[in-house]
Each structure stands twice: as C-alpha cells, then as structure tokens.
Amino acid sequence: MSVRKYGAAYQGSKSKIANDIISLLPARKYLIDAFSGGGALAHCALESGKFEHIIANDLQTKEILEAHFLWTPEQHLDFQKKWIAKEEFEKTDSLYIKTCWSFSNNRKAYIYSKDCYEYKRLLHNAICFRNYKEFEDYCGIDLSEIDSYDNLNERRKAARRAILKALKPYSFKEPINSNTHIPKEIYDAILGGNKDWRNLQSIEATKQGKGLVSIISSENLERTKYSKNVESLIQQENLLRSKSITASNISITSVSYDEIDLPDPSETVIICDPPYRNTQGYQIEFDNDKFEQWCIDKAKEGYEVFVCEYNIKNPAFEEVWSKKVINTGGGNKNQKRSIEKLYHVK
C-alpha cells in the first residue's frame, strides 16, 4: 500500500504523519505553519479543506516552498530533466538543488558516489532524452523498449522493469530467506561500465554466500534520484493544480517564527515543527526555551498553538497525540525509531 506523500523531499519531513497532525487541529480561517521546512504540513492542510488560507513560513527554505507550491508543471518537468553534475552541486547557492541532489536530502553530500556517477548520468539521459545507445554502450543493457512511453514517470518505471528483466537470468533466491540476489561481481561490472558482464560466470561460486548483492540493495542499478526527490514533486504539483489551489490559498514567508505577521487570534491556528531539543543536524542555533515562552505568550493572547516534538517537559504543553515512526534518512541501513508527539499549549 503506497503512502501519500506531502511536501517536497526534505530532511525531517512530517509527510508520513501529516494526516495525523492536521486531523487534530481545529478548523479556522488561517493556519500558520511557522517552521514549514519542505511544506508537508502546509500541503496536507491545503488538501484537508479545514483552512481558507495557509501561511507557510520558514527562515531557510523559502526557495523550496516556492518551487513546491508555486511552480508550474512545466517548471517541474524542466527541473527533472536537468542533470546536475557534482561540480555544479558544489558551486551552487540554490537550496533547492542542494536539497534534491544531495544524499538523504542533507544538502551536504552529492547524491551519487564516484563508483556509480557515470552509470546514473547515462541512465538519466536515456530516460529523459532517449539516449539509449550511450547507455547500452556503457553497460550492455538495452532500454529502447521504454521508447513507447512519453510520460517521464512511466518511462522511469519502464526502465526499472527493463533492467530487472536483464538481471533476472543472473539472479537467484537464497535458500534460507528467499531473498533474491545477484553476484556482486556482476553488480560492480554494470556500474563500472563493463558491458560484457553477462560473461562473468560467478553465480555458482557466489551461491556459497560470498559476494552477493540483494536485488533490494541493487536498486542502485534501477533508480534515478527521482524516487524520493523530484519524482514526487510533479505528482504533488498535479494534485494541487487539480484542486485549484492557487496563490490565494497560500502565502510563503521567510522570517523568524516570532516575526510572523499573525492574523486575529480567534481566526488562527499555529502549528510549529521547530528544531527539536537535544538533536543535531540543523543549520542554525535554536533557543528552545525562548521558543517555548513565545508559544505560551501566544496562547495567552488567544491563539491555538500546537507543537511537534519528541518531549517537552514544560507543564504548559499538553501532549495530545503520539506515534512511533521509523526515520530512514541515509537509507534502510540507518533506520531510527522514535516517538513523534504533538503538544497543545494550554
């Protein structure tokens, strides 16, 4: 069962739990998403119909929010087709490029390693520009069968099927857990540009349990970056447009949370997903004590204030919801389990 994705690909996104959170907020004329990040909560709120207007604010991610909510489908398509080389990634000041083309959207490390860079570049060109011959000359896999598809997303899916079909004669199931594997020798040869990889008869030797790569791990051969990054953007863009969501429904601002121009308290709900206390990885220093006092002050003024956090000890914050989640930043090997909580300021 596929999970609905909200917002742009962004480290720390609330996409998986956006529905849970938005469903608990009272309906008002305005929703203030004070730390919008990739816009997952704002996106979900737009589709919920509970709010007439949403202000998506973030001190750092205005460029990402504008791309996600305000770009046309044509702009998204152009961005999908553009290959960003490592050199350009390292030089650019574009936060959007840094996010979409970085490993686990961390905006630091380029998405592809040296070992698979050329393979990924040629796969991208085959899918986006129909340069099948260059890809086949590099790794010996013919993708011309995807030519009948015009939709870019369908072409990616067809390319994945074609690559898996090419690998099938050289894969086998492990007796113990029935996981499907291919020999690592073949995996490395394809990424490295050895188009004669089919002549590497190492399957029998690797059946003994050495030098295996599971088909799940070998998705590096099948996938371009779009699985978690740009691919979701075009789908979300089309969904937004289909609901006639326009600039009249959402405003994007880029100020500190305590500088947001707030509407009347009786008409406004504030949702905050700030940098969590005692966690690392944020680009700026954040004063959690100051933030919590601001929330208390706003609640005293009559605003409905909700905060996402792992744990808030201040008694003014009442826990109203919690859920165990799995964070997969950095891939399946780096899964971390945590309990997300939503607090309401009394």
Feature-to-residue mapping (PLM):
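Short, hydrophobic beta-strand segments that form beta-sheet elements in well-ordered domains
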Residues: 33, 54-56, 304-309
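Conserved SAM/SAH-binding loop
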Residues: 254-259
